Design a protein with these regions (language model features):
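Conserved short alpha-helical segments that host acidic/polar catalytic motifs at enzyme active sites
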Residues: 4-134
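Active-site loops and adjacent core secondary-structure elements that bind or stabilize anionic groups
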Residues: 1
Length: 134
């Protein structure tokens, strides 16, 4: 099984290490990349279509930092490649990257929508962020 995601927790800033790790995964093929970090209790994320190099440039413009972070290079299976569908998917309390297919995502999405959760993307992964928050 191969992975396209990275997670690092440290007592030092992790953004650069996550980007460097994502660059090592580029050979696997992907259509978008993203990163989320936790700093002072707040989740910050940056996502983009295209290469990790473009993500790195976007990060420089946002000054995203944190001692905990996740990242993913994504090959779309649900939802077209777009910034909205790119990973990570976050709620106020959790950020998720996922490689695979959530078979019952449609059912879970309907249950969560009845509880008042709003979905931004066309992906199955966003369900996890809301489900964990619930």
């Amino acid at each position: 099984m191969y992975k396209r995601q990275v997670g690092i927790t440290s007592n030092k800033e992790v953004t650069t290490r996550i980007i460097n790790s994502l660059k090592k995964l580029e050979y696997r093929g992907y259509d978008s990349a993203g990163i989320a970090t936790l700093k002072d209790g707040f989740i910050n994320e940056v996502k983009c279509e295209g290469r990790v190099e473009a993500l790195e440039k976007n990060i420089l413009n946002t000054n995203i930092q944190g001692e905990i972070g996740i990242g993913l290079v994504r090959w779309a299976t649900h939802g077209k490649p777009s910034t909205i569908n790119d990973h990570p998917h976050s709620s106020e309390k959790v950020s998720v990257v996922h490689n695979g297919i959530i078979e019952n995502s449609t059912i879970l999405k309907k249950v969560l929508e009845k509880k008042g959760y709003a979905f931004k993307s066309q992906t199955d992964t966003e369900v996890i962020a809301h489900l964990v928050t619930d």
